[in-house]
Amino acid sequence: MPTFKLVLSDPISGKAMQFEIKDPLAQRFVGLKIGDEIDGVILKDFISLPKGAKIKITGGSGIEGAPMVPGVPGPVKRYILAEGPPGYRPKKRGMRRKKLVRGDTISDSIVQINAVIVYPKDYSGPPAIPIGAKELEKLTKKEEAAAQ
């Protein structure tokens, strides 16, 4: 019985929300890979998404804290020689380090799933994750300035 923390980011508002996903909904995420898109309707109990919105898996981390890496196939743990993100940020240019990473497939040993909302192309409504009144005012001013 997997339990996941789903961190859902909203590209319109720039905000993120965290949800606790348990069975049977968690079983729908098992087997998905980084980059896969699923219908946003499955999260109707947690957040109201606009019609036609999808959720794109962008990453995650395992129970030991190792990040999921798109280049490692399957739900495995591997040591890689990392030169940069994801999983390692070198202090100097050219530095490399052996790091433990997870594969690109979600399994029972994944604890956190990172995802982003993919809006329909013709969507122009408010963001799914609400923002404050001041931030909304700034956002509308930027859009008006860009339109001019």
From Swiss-Prot:
Which Pfam families did the record assign? Answer: Ribosomal_S6e
According to its UniProt entry, one GO biological process term is:
translation
Is Ribosomal protein found in the keyword set?
A: yes
This chain's source organism reads Pyrobaculum arsenaticum (strain DSM 13514 / JCM 11321 / PZ6)
Mind telling me which GO cellular component terms the entry cites? ribonucleoprotein complex; ribosome
The text of the family note is:
Belongs to the eukaryotic ribosomal protein eS6 family.
Which keywords belong to this entry?
A: Ribonucleoprotein, Ribosomal protein
What domain of life does the UniProt record list for this protein's source? Archaea
Q: Which PANTHER family match?
A: 40S RIBOSOMAL PROTEIN S6
Q: Give the matching InterPro entries.
A: Ribosomal_eS6, Ribosomal_eS6_arc, Ribosomal_eS6_CS
Q: Show the SMART domains listed in the entry.
A: Ribosomal_S6e
Return one GO MF term. structural constituent of ribosome
What's the protein here called?
Small ribosomal subunit protein eS6
